[in-house]
Amino acid sequence: MLQYDKDVVLSSRIRLARNVKDIPFPTVMTEEQGKKVIELARKAILGSNTILSTQFTEYEMKKLTPLDRQALVEKHLISPDLSQNIKTGYALIKDDNTVSIMVNEEDHLRIQCILPGLKLDESWDMADKIDDLIEETIDYAYDEKIGYLTSCPTNVGTGIRASVMVHLPALTITGQISNILNSVSKIGMAVRGIYGEGTQALGDIYQISNQVTLGQSEKEIIENIEGVAKQIISSERRAREELYKKQRVQIEDRVGRAFGILSHAKVMSTKEYMTLMSDVRLGIVLGILSVDLDKLDRLTTQIQPANLQKIYGMQLNPYERDVKRAEYVSTQLNKKE
């Protein structure tokens, strides 16, 4: 069993939605008001007398290339919506990529903390610390009865969105995935693909999060998500165990073929990589393959279109990307540590 349940949980995320008092929401504010929010955020973090002031790098969307913006989206450091806000979109990203503060997305501020494995409490502690630091210099839009005021009604209240990214290959192979996801939806959780709302569950990877933030404390919301995550972890592990016991040869064949193609292919699309990666990741946690799990998880971000082009330092058309992706994956998987 891996530390922090990393065999099933890829990452844990806490995101806090906050708005500045007396400034209209980003959907209706002027460009000047957007610039004011940026200055307030800069002062709160970069101007603070804490060690944190030296640990963040600022990113103005208008100064980034489309490729740079997309690379940040692929790393889950900014949202697709923020990447499209060229006029007033801005982000402060911690140098170790664990925290990002998105400015002028759907809300004035979205404080996000992402950590590997099941670490919701640690993610919350970090996000809460940043939130407190910002609140020292910014007056938030807050109502005594309702809580934090947000652009979208589903975020009103605590303004917290807690989520886990889970890899569920065995539940998918055994046909149990629909029942599991339906059960999760019925208890008020949202289920999305790897890049959030409206995205596909590529590579059997799903994002589970709370839907509503009103009427519950931050602690209750986090405990609910953690409880659901632990049930899903148990179901997936049980499915893996039964699958390997009943279909050992077929699973070893499936994993071996997937690894063979990943490590030797000459052309590979993102979608094909994600499908094969899912089988290889299953093979690693079942002990069939001795590939480093963290290395494979890093690779899954590195081979996404924008990050791949940044690694090679050149613009590539779709076919060239598929060739370079196969080359990069092969090099990484065949490299002796």
UniProtKB/Swiss-Prot annotation:
InterPro entries documented for this protein = Arg_Kinase, ATP-guanido_PTrfase, ATP-guanido_PTrfase_AS, ATP-guanido_PTrfase_cat, Gln_synth/guanido_kin_cat_dom
Q: Which SUPFAM superfamilies match?
A: Glutamine synthetase/guanido kinase
Q: Where does ATP bind?
A: 11-15, 76, 110, 161-165, 192-197
One cellular-component annotation, GO: extracellular space
Determine if ATP-binding is one of this entry's keywords.
yes
**GO terms classed as biological process:** phosphocreatine biosynthetic process
User: Coordinates of motif RDXXRA motif of the pArg binding pocket involved in allosteric regulation in the sequence?
Assistant: 321-326
A Pfam family assignment? ATP-gua_Ptrans
List the molecular function annotations (GO) for this entry.
Answer: ATP binding; creatine kinase activity; protein kinase activity
Query: What region holds the Phosphagen kinase C-terminal domain?
Result: 8-239
**Which EC class does it fall in?**
transferase
Q: Report the EC number(s), separated by commas if there are several.
A: 2.7.14.1
Lineage top rank: taxon: Bacteria
Catalytic function, reaction form: L-arginyl-[protein] + ATP = N(omega)-phospho-L-arginyl-[protein] + ADP + H(+)
Keyword line: Allosteric enzyme, ATP-binding, Kinase, Nucleotide-binding, Transferase
- NCBIfam families associated with the record: PRK01059.1-4
**Which family does the UniProt entry place this protein in?**
Belongs to the ATP:guanido phosphotransferase family.
- Tell me, in a sentence or two, what this protein's role is: Catalyzes the specific phosphorylation of arginine residues in proteins.
Name of the protein in question: Protein-arginine kinase
Biological source species: Caldanaerobacter subterraneus subsp. tengcongensis (strain DSM 15242 / JCM 11007 / NBRC 100824 / MB4) (Thermoanaerobacter tengcongensis)
